Structures are given as structure tokens and as C-alpha cells.
């Protein structure tokens, strides 16, 4: 991440999604806990323990009331905790889990570039969703990696992992290359990195 920031003048951005085989992150009634199993969730928390900041939109913050902390499988916190960032104009209630403890930021903007400007001293930023904010970062060409946790299940309907993007034809697609594939219990973890020469993209780490 340090070399990436030196070259591009901004943090490395990883988008994290957890979906069923048919690309859903929640059932039609909105339930989403849990799409993936305990091994995948433990893996995601270990990654959280190494990043500088974790970003969600106000929709996710208000709907799920997440803590966004990095916790070991036994529930104990990791020594390093990421800065918890919520983006959007709606305020969170005073008792929101995100507000507990130090390291909380609210960026009152939907602009991904504005979020990264606030986080300019960070090396590695994780965008955890929901679909609107991930779609916004994709549209802004500001996703360098995707951490995809794939659960062996079908929902058929429900929320998609990435919101609407300004892509109208196949040639507009944003291309990533598969970098890591790991089995995590019944789930599959795949890290994709932006294909070299495609946008800002990933260069080094």
C-alpha cells in the first residue's frame, strides 16, 4: 500500500463483497446475517485488522448498525483497529454502534474522491458497502482490488452486491484479474486486482 500511495497519491482501495452464487448480498426481506460461514467471516476480520480505514454508507450503517471493528473468532478485538468511516448526508443516532469508542469519522458527502481526501494519510482503505457506495467507487474508477467471499447458496432475488454504474455496453466493463483463490470452509475467497493498464489500477504492494 505504501508504494501504491507514492505512485498514485491516494490510498489503495479494496472493495469487500460477500455474495451467494447468484450475486445476492441479502434476501428479499433484507436479512443478510449470515451469507457466509464462520471461516470466511474470521478471514474478513483478519483483513480488517491490517487496514487503515473501513468505509460504509449511511444506508448500511442505519440498516445493519455494524460495529466495523476487527475481532478474533473468540470475539476479542485485534490490537489494531481501523478508523470507522460512514459516508452520506444522513446523521447516525447517538447510540449507533459505529460511534462507540475513538476512531469514528462521518464524511457528509457521497463523493468517493472527497472520502479519500479526508483519508489522505491512510495507506489501505476497505469499502464494505453497501451496493450504492461500492457502485459509486467503481464509477469514480477508485476500486483497485475486490475481496469476494462466495457462499454456495442461491437466493434468486434480493439486493445485488454492486449498485448502478455508468456502464451501457460490454466494452465499458471494468476488468480485474484473479490474484488469490482460497477455500474458507464451504465458502470461496477470491481477490481480484485491477488489470494492469486499466484505469489507475493496482501496481504494487
Where are these regions (language model features)?
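Enzymes that bind and transform nitrogen-containing heteroaromatic metabolites
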Residues: 3-5, 9-205
